[in-house]
């Protein structure tokens, strides 16, 4: 079959979505160096900022985990977990695995928007070797885990809670990024900017990596 015949709508479709993000990550996050690595954090945090702007979120907690993972927890309404009519799966799965899923949600209920590049949390998922999303909503905790953007099981209940909000824990894929070393000061600068721009929103940043502390357990400043 000729190359011309191979270039069809089907072949283009095959490169859309999560697969295309992994093949061309720089198109979505700028680059696969330090800037792109830190941009992943901004994308997740920006969803919490949207909730704050809508008057539903007052706290965002960002943690750098051992192994250069990132945890972002907010006290917003929580990503919807009900079945999405068009997709036939939980809305949480749609948000986490469909590029541009924000347009699939009613503007009055929930939207997902991105940061600088407007790509959203699904791109973070695609570029992570592991990601876990937990939603605290209406007294229950709903979870789903992913590997390189692919869901490992359907959204399920995992317990009860007296909190509300969304927690995302992700570990960037070492096959994608040149370095996995998050710089505390880069993230701190961005979080300070967001806090200044969003009055009434409390943003915290914690570095749990042992390499970031001195012998007495105090935070070391970046060089």
Task: Give residue ranges: language-model regions.
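GHKL-type ATPase core
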Residues: 2-10, 68-91, 102-223
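Secondary-structure capping and boundary motifs in well-ordered enzyme cores
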Residues: 33-37, 64, 116
């Amino acid at each position: 079959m000729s190359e011309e015949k191979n270039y069809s709508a089907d072949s283009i479709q095959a490169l859309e979505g999560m697969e295309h993000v992994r093949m061309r990550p720089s198109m979505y996050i700028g680059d696969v160096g330090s800037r792109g690595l830190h941009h992943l954090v901004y994308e997740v945090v920006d969803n919490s900022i949207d909730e704050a702007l809508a008057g539903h979120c007052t706290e965002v907690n960002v943690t750098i985990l051992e192994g250069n993972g990132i945890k972002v927890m907010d006290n917003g309404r929580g990503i919807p977990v009900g079945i999405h009519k068009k997709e036939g799966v939980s809305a949480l799965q749609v948000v986490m695995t469909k590029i541009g899923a924000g347009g699939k949600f009613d503007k009055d209920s929930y939207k997902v928007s991105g940061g600088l590049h407007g790509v959203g949390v699904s791109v973070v998922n695609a570029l992570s070797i592991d990601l876990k999303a937990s939603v605290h909503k209406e007294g229950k905790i709903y979870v789903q885990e992913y590997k390189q953007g692919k869901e490992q099981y359907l959204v399920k209940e995992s317990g009860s809670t007296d909190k509300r909000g969304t927690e995302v824990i992700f570990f960037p894929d070492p096959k994608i990024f040149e370095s996995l070393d998050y710089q505390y000061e880069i993230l701190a600068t961005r979080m300070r900017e967001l806090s200044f721009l969003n009055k009434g929103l409390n943003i915290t940043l914690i570095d749990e990596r042992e390499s970031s502390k001195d012998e007495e357990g105090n935070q070391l400043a970046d060089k």
